Amino acid sequence: MAAAAQRLLAASTKIVGVGRNFVAHAKELGNPVPKEPVLFLKPTSSFLHAGVAGAAIEVPEPVESLHHEVELAVVISQRARDVPEASAMDFVGGYALALDMTARELQSAAKSAGLPWTLGKAQDTFTPISAVIPKSDVANPDDLELWLKVDDELRQKGSTSDMIFKIPSLISYISSIMTLMEGDVILTGTPEGVGPVRPGQKIKAGITGLIDVEFDVQKRKRSFST
């Protein structure tokens, strides 16, 4: 079971992000609380797998405000299209701890111009992710404590119990719009406390009692615009 869960990420075709899925986080950024899920896409090339020697979150020039967002990732086990909420959990193969790294000034500029968030969300190393936790190892995904520290300072701590849209609702909604494939990842949103990280700092994050990860932050050697 564990080996099968680890193989899922290798098959992933896309990462579906869910924005503003915690009331406190929506409010801390001055956003309204959504009435339906706010979705965005990230490419699988943005994955940064925990435990890989030398792997680090890269801050590209000229980004000055790269923010951390700790999230529960849901990993899909099989093709899912128009899935009803009642059977949505049958399509979950496992979970992971993920970070939705966000170049905040690029995202804010895109939002102001009415443009997609791609530059702020989709760059290489912007989705650090843990190993997959088999579904059978998670008794209640609606009651998991997420936490994140920067240089041992606690920045984020929250529970998936505070998510506005729960996992079955997200799977049903997303699969009504696009087909979810085996290995696809849903980032379910972040609790409050997001903030910037700088090159030279270290991020530690985890799901209490299940898994923890750490990533170094370094400056990318080239600007994303050259």
From Swiss-Prot:
Mg(2+) binds at E69, E71, D100. Its EC number is 5.3.2.2. One of its GO terms (cellular component) is mitochondrion. It is found in: Mitochondrion. The keyword Transit peptide applies. It catalyses: oxaloacetate = enol-oxaloacetate. It holds the Pfam family FAA_hydrolase. The keyword Transit peptide applies. This is Oxaloacetate tautomerase FAHD2, mitochondrial. The lineage of its organism: Eukaryota, Viridiplantae, Streptophyta, Embryophyta, Tracheophyta. The gene is FAHD2.
